């Protein structure tokens, strides 16, 4: 039985990375340093732009985060690909929250636009995921649009984020 709360703490997310939140067959979030959120503040099966599900999560920003030390020296900025990966992480987390089983894999994205950046002076990144469709057949797949905000300002959008849950990834 999946623990279907509307919000999750950092410890809950770490438990997901250890395979403890959604059970042995459920999808896992990555462990630190690749876990790109500190908490999930809202998860619903309705709502969002398409009324088919919504997730909102946050990452606290501080200058000591690992990526600021190497991307780029003298010009620290959070890599845009980490924000994109966070959105994929949340799509997979939602599929597990719905009871889906399997190993999560990003399958693609239709379009990504960057209109801003995350600097070490920022306080918080917010991720918003708006589900468009859930396929629950042999392959469980989520299709969603996403937004990344820094200190409440929209800086990335992604259309048609796709994540699938696979029983066997050996041929993937």
UniProtKB/Swiss-Prot annotation:
<comment type="function">
    <text>Necessary for the introduction of cis unsaturation into fatty acids. Catalyzes the dehydration of (3R)-3-hydroxydecanoyl-ACP to E-(2)-decenoyl-ACP and then its isomerization to Z-(3)-decenoyl-ACP. Can catalyze the dehydratase reaction for beta-hydroxyacyl-ACPs with saturated chain lengths up to 16:0, being most active on intermediate chain length.</text>
</comment>
<keyword id="KW-0413">Isomerase</keyword>
<keyword id="KW-0456">Lyase</keyword>
<dbReference type="GO" id="GO:0006636">
    <property type="term" value="P:unsaturated fatty acid biosynthetic process"/>
</dbReference>
<keyword id="KW-0276">Fatty acid metabolism</keyword>
<comment type="similarity">
    <text>Belongs to the thioester dehydratase family. FabA subfamily.</text>
</comment>
<dbReference type="Pfam" id="PF07977">
    <property type="entry name" value="FabA"/>
</dbReference>
<dbReference type="InterPro" id="IPR029069">
    <property type="entry name" value="HotDog_dom_sf"/>
</dbReference>
<comment type="pathway">
    <text>Lipid metabolism; fatty acid biosynthesis.</text>
</comment>
<keyword id="KW-0443">Lipid metabolism</keyword>
<keyword id="KW-0275">Fatty acid biosynthesis</keyword>
<comment type="subunit">
    <text>Homodimer.</text>
</comment>
<feature type="active site">
    <location>
        <position position="71"/>
    </location>
</feature>
<keyword id="KW-0963">Cytoplasm</keyword>
<dbReference type="InterPro" id="IPR010083">
    <property type="entry name" value="FabA"/>
</dbReference>
<dbReference type="GO" id="GO:0034017">
    <property type="term" value="F:trans-2-decenoyl-acyl-carrier-protein isomerase activity"/>
</dbReference>
<protein>
    <recommendedName>
        <fullName>3-hydroxydecanoyl-[acyl-carrier-protein] dehydratase</fullName>
        <ecNumber>4.2.1.59</ecNumber>
        <ecNumber>5.3.3.14</ecNumber>
    </recommendedName>
</protein>
<dbReference type="GO" id="GO:0019171">
    <property type="term" value="F:(3R)-hydroxyacyl-[acyl-carrier-protein] dehydratase activity"/>
</dbReference>
<dbReference type="GO" id="GO:0005737">
    <property type="term" value="C:cytoplasm"/>
</dbReference>
<dbReference type="InterPro" id="IPR013114">
    <property type="entry name" value="FabA_FabZ"/>
</dbReference>
<keyword id="KW-0444">Lipid biosynthesis</keyword>
């Amino acid at each position: 039985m999946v623990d279907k709360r509307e919000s999750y703490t950092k410890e809950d997310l770490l438990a997901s990375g250890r395979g403890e939140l959604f059970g042995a067959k459920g999808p896992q979030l990555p462990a630190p340093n690749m876990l790109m959120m500190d908490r999930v503040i809202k998860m619903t099966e309705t709502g969002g732009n398409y009324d088919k599900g919504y997730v909102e999560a946050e990452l606290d920003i501080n200058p000591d985060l690992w990526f600021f030390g190497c991307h780029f020296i003298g010009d620290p900025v959070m890599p845009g690909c980490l924000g994109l990966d966070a959105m994929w992480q949340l799509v997979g987390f939602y599929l597990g929250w719905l009871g889906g089983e399997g190993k999560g894999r990003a399958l693609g994205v239709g379009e990504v636009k960057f209109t801003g950046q995350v600097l070490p002076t920022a306080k918080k990144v917010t991720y918003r995921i708006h589900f468009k469709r859930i396929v629950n057949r042999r392959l469980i797949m989520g299709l969603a649009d996403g937004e990344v905000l820094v200190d409440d300002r929209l800086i990335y959008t992604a259309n048609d984020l796709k994540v699938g849950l696979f029983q066997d990834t050996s041929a993937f």
